Amino acid sequence: MYAIAFLVVKDTQDYHPKGVQQAYTDIGAVLAKFGFVRTQGSLYINMNEDMANLFQAMNALKQLAWISQSVRDIRAFRIEQWSDFTDFIRN
């Protein structure tokens, strides 16, 4: 399982033609094409173990004309285990 996490800077409104919120939406749409699902905030996970898929997703993000000036930090990492404690905390 792989994850991608990123931070979009406030100045994105100067680079993206439709502003910060649309930038997040566009990033999510690109990642969804490669099977990534938003879990919280700017964290997207993918159950696919194929690193080539991860690279293809990153290359697709890189094609967005505004992204290099809008993302302060973007990281990809492998998740060994994923435990969802939401139900445990709520009950």
Curated annotation (Swiss-Prot):
Its EC number is 3.1.-.-. The keyword Ligase does not apply. InterPro entries: VapD. One of its GO terms (molecular function) is nuclease activity. Keywords: Hydrolase, Nuclease, Virulence. The keyword Ribonucleoprotein does not apply. Homodimer. Belongs to the VapD ribonuclease family. Cleaves ssRNA, mostly between U:A. This is Endoribonuclease VapD. It comes from Haemophilus influenzae (strain ATCC 51907 / DSM 11121 / KW20 / Rd).
